[in-house]
Each structure stands twice: as structure tokens, then as C-alpha cells.
Amino acid sequence: MAKTIAYDEEARRGLERGLNSLADAVKVTLGPKGRNVVLEKKWGAPTITNDGVSIAKEIELEDPYEKIGAELVKEVAKKTDDVAGDGTTTATVLAQALVREGLRNVAAGANPLGLKRGIEKAVEKVTETLLKSAKEVETKEQIAATAGISAGDQSIGDLIAEAMDKVGNEGVITVEESNTFGLQLELTEGMRFDKGYISGYFVTDAERQEAVLEDPYILLVSSKVSTVKDLLPLLEKVIQSGKPLLIIAEDVEGEALSTLVVNKIRGTFKSVAVKAPGFGDRRKAMLQDMAILTGGQVISEEVGLSLETADVSLLGKARKVVVTKDETTIVEGAGDAEAIQGRVAQIRAEIENSDSDYDREKLQERLAKLAGGVAVIKAGAATEVELKERKHRIEDAVRNAKAAVEEGIVAGGGVALLQSAPSLEELSLTGDEATGANIVRVALSAPLKQIALNGGLEPGVVAEKVSNLPAGHGLNAATGEYEDLLAAGVADPVKVTRSALQNAASIAALFLTTEAVVADKPEKAAAPAGDPTGGMGGMDF
């Protein structure tokens, strides 16, 4: 395909136009008085959102240079969303301010590489200042306030704080769509996985269609169980103990299944058979998680264990097991606390090293099942469009709350960034590096100015006033008051704020050092096909 090339100022200005097109659409959503953006979909109802990354992902520009500029800023929003789960609009606003100020200096003759070094040193200093000023999140109220700001709804913040209180900081909080109006919180104690009983004959509570086993033994097998002679020696030992048995295996079928069912119906022996969750290596890992949680061992030929020679000492234990048609919950496994912590640390290390979003999500679920629990927030709304928008806001707020617990919080509303600008005085830079640091100083006020603008206030006046207030005091855009923001519950996770600045600066530095852009030449539309009759009109058939 033919390419088109632009150089120098033309190249940089083309990229900047693309950046501005995207940033101008995103920045109207910033702050408590930010507006929404409607996104048209090829199929189905349009989406209404105030989430920066969702808007950025939808924008495709026609001009090849502008398209590349917009794609670079999308990267800022996506990276910030991946790392911190929020702050995508702030990152976009910062990137726009850094690029605008930087290109002005490049056009005036500054050396782009000198500016880049200055920007990097200034960002490092501001990040250090932000982390030093961060306050640890210690109370449920602080989590509720932070999540409430992210979602733009305090009731959502309260519910997320309640969920985190119940399942712990490592627990998983999932958001589901509900048919009923409003918000509900459901909590799961113990380990739950999405596999139910193999046969309906195992049910012990006919009304609720559940099989409930009190203080059972748990047999974990990595292969299929089909012949009864493999299972019989172990079954006899379990029957002698008088305890029920939960079997989790790749599958339980044939005479092994019918033997268990017949004994259950006759009342001789209570048991439930369940298929192991997952596939392949993930199934093996989840069985191992269950073994550690219940204090048992996975019976597998890989480790030299077989069903015929298995003993009761290889079985896991739990206080209670509840099995429904679709899921199994193991409550209070009898595993060793130290072994569980070791497994948790191992999974956490795998999460750090994983570069696949899907793998990371699955590992996170396994971690939650071992370390905490699972909370489900069910969100309902009047229309499908509102429901999607609400669900998205809650998911963002959950990640925001987790980021707050991880690294602490700073004053929100763009104030922490603006008030960290004086720390740049400590840098002893000269020439273009000093100019680069000054570009960052100017850009640090951009989020606050945009929040003020969206709230109908004069940006310059607000920024000037806030820069002269004590640390942590600033504009609460929701009320229009100047106050101690942390005390008023206006806080941002420092992880979100620093990620937004670091990612914006990274892309801005690339913009400034760009000297040529190579893009695909737009294809000309094909000429309309000619008259297939060759223009021989007037012939009468």
C-alpha cells in the first residue's frame, strides 16, 4: 500500500490535531459537573458514558496523521485504565496540556530531547511528592468517599465499601446486571466455583434443590472416575467414619456414579459428585487450590497416587459444603493457614508476571477464592442504556477503591497535582531541561482548570486561588466551596493520579521528539461502474 510522509512541524501539528479532537471529546466528562458523551453503536442502542477510555476507544479519525495522533492518546487512556482502573480523563487532559505547551517550545527553537529529559525528571519529582503526601486509607468511610467520587454516586461508594469490608482487600467484587431496580449486594463465604451436582438424585433439600453436606470428607481426583472397584476401598473407609463425601473429579460416570446414587437413595451413605471446574492446566491448578484450602491432596498419577491405594488421610475436610444445580460452595476448609498463605503469595507472583489480561483475571479470581471471598454487586436500571452506563461506573469505582487501599489517597479535584508543582523548585536544571520541567509545571494545573470550566467557573481564577491555599485545601466543585478536600471526602487514589501523569508524560515526550510521520495513503473511492449495456439505450425488446 502506498504511504504518505510528513516532516517537522507539519508532522507534529497533524498529530496534535488528532490528539485535540480526541481530548476535546473526553475532557467534557471531567469532574462532578462533567457531562456525558453518547457513543453510537453499529448494532443496538447507543451507549452513554462519562468514562474517558470508553470514549477514546470509539474515536476513529479520517485524516491519517490525525488518526495516529488520536491512537497515541488512546494508549495513554488505556494504560492508565489497565494500571489504576480510573483517571483516564485526567491522563488525557494532562497529555493534551503537555503536548500543547511542548510543541510551542519546539516551534520556538527548543531542543526536543532536552525537553524530554526535563519532562521525565519533573514527572519523577512530582510522583515522589505525591507518594510522600499520600494518606493511608484506614476507614470504611474513606473507601466509600473515594469510590463514591469515581462513580459520581455516594450510594455506590457506600456499597463498595461494604463489599470490601466483608471480603477483604484481596477479595473479588464482581458487578452483574439485575432485573430489579436499584443496587443489591450478595456475599459468598468460602470458595465457590461454577459446577453443580452431576445427578439430581444427590439433592438433600428438595425445596431449595440443594445438596448440603455437614462436616464432609472431600475427595479430589484429576481424572475420570468410572469403575466402582477403584472407588470401593476408599468408600468403605469413609462409610465407617460416618461422614458424608464430596467427590470433585474430571467426571464421575458409569457404575461409580450409579453406586453413589443408589447408596444415597437407600440412605446408606450420603455423597455428592461434582465435575472439577476449568480445563487443562487451569483445572489442575484449581484442584490444587482446593486441596490446600481443605487440607487434602489431589489424587493424580502425576504424583504417584491412585484411587485404589488412597487413604482417608489424603481427603480434604470442610465445615460445610453446599451444592446446587450450577455451583458448589466449600465453607471453612480445614487447610493449614500457612500453606494457604504460601499459595496466595505464589498466585500473586503469577499475577505480577502475567502479560495476558484474561490470565490475570482468572488468577485474580483464584486468589480471591483462597484469600477472601466473593461479593457480587447487582445493578438495575430503568433502561438497558442506563444499566450499561451504571454497571461501567460501578466497575470503575471498584478498581478505584482497590487502588486507594493499595497506595493511599491524596486530595482530589486536580488539587494534589497543582499543589505538587512547587516541589519542582528543588530540581537544579538548566537550558532546555529547565524548560521541560516548566512544561510539566504548566500542565499540572490543567485537570483543575478543566474541572472548574465544566463547573461553570473561571479556570484561571480558580487555579490561582488554589495554588495559594494550604496543602490539601482546594475547590470542591460539587458544592463550589473552597475547603479541606480530604476532610470533605474529595479524594483520589494516589495510584490513579501518578499513573495519569506518568502515562501522559510518556506519550507527550514521544510527540515532541517526532520528526517524521509515515502513514497509509487514503484510498480513493472506486469509480462507479459504467452502464453494463454499453450505453445502447433506446433499444426496444
Curated annotation (Swiss-Prot):
Decide whether keyword RNA-binding is in the record.
Answer: no
Location in the cell reads:
Secreted, Capsule; Cell surface; Secreted, Cell wall
Q: Binding of ATP: at which residues? A: 29-32, 86-90, 413, 476-478, 492
Q: Which domain of life is it from?
A: Bacteria
Q: Which reaction does it catalyse?
A: ATP + H2O + a folded polypeptide = ADP + phosphate + an unfolded polypeptide
A single cellular component GO annotation: extracellular region
Single annotated GO MF: unfolded protein binding
Q: NCBIfam families per the record?
A: GroEL, PRK00013.1, PRK12849.1, PRK12850.1, PRK12851.1
Q: How does it assemble?
A: Forms a cylinder of 14 subunits composed of two heptameric rings stacked back-to-back. Interacts with the co-chaperonin GroES.
Protein name (record): Chaperonin GroEL 2
